[in-house]
């Protein structure tokens, strides 16, 4: 019953789709001609009454009614309502098609997994596929009028060969107040397990694959049953139907051509045939007819599913696959391209024009000059970056140092002191002895290994999140250098001195670090995991000894001048430790 026109529209040529308008079976004309004739008849009856049967006063009242209907008829959202409704119906229609039970995959597994060319093996395979076809027929008989007319009772299924008399009696014995389409699938599962126990199915993995495919078909049958049970909500269908028919009932009055002598706006001409009104009826009413035909594709319309053909085809191919084709293979022979590494199947004269070379990619035919294909030295990459590259920030790694701050600087190697205006910026590193320098080098290497890849020197990436005021944790396999052990081992006397009020200048120098740094380190000290920590308590420090102070080489410029001098707190703490020791 399905109207197939795929071959007629295989090639997009002049008139390929226009020829489809001449088809009658499954066409919109066949569905709509009755309603269209009724609409034409009603329109011309109202026109005849307006022109011939009404008095002048009655004509004036009718003309006012016509203008009123014509002005408010566009307020009905017919396109909006029809669009959503038809989309819902078409989606539902296609989902029902996708859930039609095809036994092809199941019959392949049965023919492959259930072994034995004897009478018992043949009986086992045919019975399994007959159960599968019986389950399909029972569900199609429940939802399709065409299949029900073919098998109106279980006795007809027995006479058709889908069921044996003993199986029919078994079904009647297990009669329930529910649809029994699921019973053959239970028989299939039990018989498959029996075949595995009897050695007809070698491995439980094969049995599991067979049952999975069986459950897939059972699920599809359940979906068809649910689609037949749960329809599109009735209120939605009623709203769409009322919207369409009320629109065209208003058109019967509002689209009448009035007397041109009375000079009504928009009624200067008196056309006998309202062409665009008829086209509008054809489009909107035809749109509704599409939804009416697709809402249940298991009927007997021209475009409904061929359910009886599906029943015949499924039984024929499934029994053939598991019986005559079981282990019936053609002999293996060498193909005609056995010694040909590049086989070229021949073309006929009609298909020679469709022969095409292989596609290698859109850039395959691009040609470059010899100079453009030469690699550039690294020192010339920056010069050839171009305006766009400079605009996007494409710079060489040698010209863009990584971003650091006063806290991540602890993990970086110390550089030599820079000079500004003839005065050294930092003279503290020069005063360290050789042992302290070795300790600081070992500590920096340990910090480098414990740092993430993005935090190591030479790694250029986006700015990272600033480090919090938490104690630095060294990995268990790494040990802190000697200098830092002195820092963590400050005696109680030094701690008491650090808690005393410091001078205002020292307070300003370390005002960047809050006093909550000590509180954040307390939970880690009570942890059961052994960790080596270094606590930088820079909140309140006692004044350094005189021999460790730096000479004041720059005029005081307030707190901002002190902040700009990024002094390493590691050196300050180590010198402080030596002073107390």
UniProtKB/Swiss-Prot annotation:
Topological domain ranges for the Extracellular compartment: 52-60, 256-274
InterPro entries: Bestrophin, Bestrophin-like
Claim: Calcium is one of the keywords in the record: yes
Binding site for Ca(2+): 10, 293, 296, 301, 304
Topology Cytoplasmic: residue spans: 1-31, 83-237, 289-581
Superkingdom of origin: Eukaryota
Bilayer topology annotation: Multi-pass membrane protein
CC per GO annotation: basolateral plasma membrane; chloride channel complex; membrane microdomain; plasma membrane; presynapse
One Pfam match: Bestrophin
Post-translational modifications reported in the UniProt record: Phosphorylated (in vitro).
Bilayer-crossing regions: 32-51, 61-82, 238-255, 275-288
Start and end residues of each stretch annotated as Disordered: 416-440
Catalytic activity: chloride(in) = chloride(out); hydrogencarbonate(in) = hydrogencarbonate(out); 4-aminobutanoate(in) = 4-aminobutanoate(out); L-glutamate(out) = L-glutamate(in)
One biological process term in Gene Ontology: regulation of synaptic plasticity
Protein localization: Cell membrane; Basolateral cell membrane
UniProt keyword terms in alphabetical order: Calcium, Cell membrane, Chloride, Chloride channel, Ion channel, Ion transport, Membrane, Metal-binding, Phosphoprotein, Transmembrane, Transmembrane helix, Transport
Domain-related comment: The C-terminal auto-inhibitory segment (AS) modulates the open/closed conformation of the channel. In a closed conformation, the C-terminal auto-inhibitory segment constricts the channel concentrically by wrapping around the channel periphery in an inter-protomer manner. To allow chloride movement, the C-terminal auto-inhibitory segment opens partially, leading to significantly smaller chloride movement.
Described purpose of this protein according to its UniProt entry: Ligand-gated anion channel that allows the movement of anions across cell membranes when activated by calcium (Ca2+). Allows the movement of chloride and hydrogencarbonate. Found in a partially open conformation leading to significantly smaller chloride movement. Upon F2R/PAR-1 activation, the sequestered calcium is released into the cytosol of astrocytes, leading to the (Ca2+)-dependent release of L-glutamate into the synaptic cleft that targets the neuronal postsynaptic GRIN2A/NMDAR receptor resulting in the synaptic plasticity regulation.
Subunit composition and interactions: Interacts with YWHAG; this interaction promotes the ligand-gated L-glutamate channel activity leading to the positive regulation of NMDA glutamate receptor activity through the L-glutamate secretion.
Family: Belongs to the anion channel-forming bestrophin (TC 1.A.46) family. Calcium-sensitive chloride channel subfamily.
Name assigned to this protein: Bestrophin-1
UniProt source species: Sus scrofa
